[in-house]
Amino acid sequence: MMLKANCYKYRIKKGVMDLKVNDKISSLRKLMKERGITAYIIPTYDPHQSEYLSDHYKTRVWISGFTGSAGTVVVTEDEAILWTDGRYWIQAENEIAGSEIKLYKSGIPGVPDYFEYLRDNLKDGDSVGFDGRIFPQSDVKKLEDYLKNKDIKLIEEYDLIGELWKDRPEKPKSKAFVLDVKYAGKTAREKIEEVREEMDKKAADYFLLGSLDDIAWVYNIRGRDVANNPVVISYGLISKDNAWLFIDQDKLDDETRAYLRENGVEIDDYEKVADYVRKIEKGKNIFIDPSRINRWLYNSIPEGCKIIEGTNITTNLKAVKNPVEIENQRKAYIKDGVALVKFMYWLDQNVGRINITEVSAAEKLEEFRRQQEGFIEPSFDTIAAYKENAAMMHYKAEEGKSNYELKKEGLFLVDSGGQYFEGTTDITRTIVLGSITEEEKRDFTLTLKGHINLISARFLYGTTGSNVDVLSRYPLWQEGLDYKCGTGHGVGFLLNVHEGPHRISTIPNDVVLEKGMVVTIEPGVYKEGKHGIRIENVVVVDDDIETEYGGKFMKFDILSFVPIDLEAVDVNLLTKKEINWLNNYHREVYNRISPYLSEEERKWLKEKTREIC
């Protein structure tokens, strides 16, 4: 059905970026020809292989106009291609429309990834270029493996986008701060000793760290160098006797310097990390995660050293939250729940009465979060998606491009989170604004059934996220539905909202769900041109029961408490067990959140958490 022009703004102004993007690609090709480069790769990386980037490193966004958080562009003499996953297909099609860039949908059978594309389309004597300061060693190794049967040269010293990007933003210069032990639960010295214990098990003399969240975790420092991700750009190096932090020292105040030194951490300039690595004695064993170390730093490791590769030691340690962190997380989710309920009440009272758009709704939600003590910033850009915009999983409303006005009809998906001193939050609710279709109600209820099926599961110790993923998809599969993304991801503690190594996904993962791991559960239904539905809660893995015949079993303990919109639930599709779960959950929502609300908000919440049968 066509949208009435006087009711809604157009979703995307197609073609706005076209000429600019094509001009940039043309300029890039000229540079490539000058440097003897046949194909040039522009990934979504910074020197630390971060998922979310500071503006300075958004080279792929600059060259393509595609603003999603994941994707790779390859430019050759006669083609420009963008690869991205199912979360962004709709968004990517809109944002590159009219330009010469082609979209290759990652994960679709028969669609080559960019490694396969380069292997199949380049010939002997050709060359591949990339910026080795941002390209991870693991990707270089994979590229070498794919191209090994051809005489193709790798040229890794040129940041060609940097040469073209004349108004490139400066590198971030935010101040670092110390995360108090009352939040972290352990001092930096204690964490460094835990790292050394793991180094001993791996026979490692040194542990080289490039990933910002791991560095922030082990040294108990945080910063504002990346929007929504409280990290500070730096490198780390830990030996059996010493620990170093390489950082722009202007970012450190006296308190932070003193804390680091008290905890056995030496400080030096950011640019000197490679000098330190080059001086490591021959015969020493250096542990690295090749997916989190860039090619330039990898090349600084002396030839006489043995390189031990694996997942960062800190990745596994920080994934299992300690009791202090978990208790703080519970406090953060109460605060977040209060903000969400106040927002939902405000929305209910004002949609159709005052002008509310996707953008202004997201701003209002942030306003409610900022009222909570200890709130620092959002944990990611709020996804406030009305009607068919919600079919784009990581949609972002923007003034002048896409910004629907909310009406008293349809579904409104809000996926948001906050950074608090007590932890990082993430929550999604799909809200009924007025009349909805039977199809929308059915899809919402099927999503809810999948959510309940997984969140209430008991599972044997040793289970991985890929083992339990099917539980959330099963009700959808029975109706011929699925979602082209994972079901859940780990969440950091005042760190990245996406954290590994665990996840819940169809993609095989051998990481066991351990007690203390925090993870999201967020099944959904996404129908292009119609609607998007997602229900997300955050849980912590906990012990359940131990039996003579089964052994040790685990469960999910819920952290987030926000009402699930009953107006979208078809009770006839729910089992008695599912109804009981929903009633019990809503009872907890009311009991935990209502003490922090006004009288009118409490009355509203009581109705929204009423028992169903």
What role is predicted for each listed range?
Residues 1:
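AAA+ ATPase active-site-proximal loops
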Residues 4-613:
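Active-site neighborhoods and metal-handling regions in enzymes and metal-associated proteins
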